[in-house]
């Protein structure tokens, strides 16, 4: 009997602890939501004082992406070339960071800067080929881009971990339902986080943008959106993706560097 009572007391105690923890969590979430609402209202007022309308929907409290370092991967480049040129490839090192792959179907050139170009008869059903490539190599999926003859060209943005890469695109060209060329920026699939602390939050990026606008005298009357993205930078052997906040305005788009705080426009 005493054992049964003891078990009941323990169960009741655990239930009360769970209720307490849930209540504490609910209070914290409510406090956080209230603090975010207040911060948003203050930002809107700050912009209004400068004659700029800031959409509340543009204010986000999500963290920016991490800075990334991408090491060149010649194996991944060869695999990408094989998508269009087949597996029977002849590889050559042309020097200066240039690697080439050739087959009976065409030729692929990859550079240390991340630039690449593949030309030849790269396959029929170009729309399907392009969709598969974009799915495998993190590119935005294009809308309809071919005319009735199966000809046309389209340029899509590169992505990394789901974020757009400014300065990174891939262009596809088709003639008479045959894909003829693929060119643009090739990003290795594997990356290393280079920096994860001290990056500018969205609210800090917005205030940095507002200060830069005031200093430059730029004519901007409304901020319509704010979104994270990457900027592609390259050296002789390393590609770097620097996180940015993109500020969409009624004039031009601006970019705030999450590492340095520098503000630039498109």
Language-model features, listed with the residues they occupy:
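Extracytoplasmic/luminal low-complexity segments enriched in Pro/Gly and acidic/polar residues
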Residues: 191-266
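Long, charged/polar, surface-exposed segments that mediate recognition or autoinhibition
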Residues: 114-222
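Preferential activation on post-signal-peptide N-terminal prodomains/segments
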Residues: 1-144
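Generic hydrophobic secondary-structure signal
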Residues: 10, 14-17, 170, 179-182, ...
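Exposed beta-strand-loop-beta-strand "reactive/processing" segments of non-cytosolic proteins
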Residues: 78-102, 112, 118-119, 136-176, ...
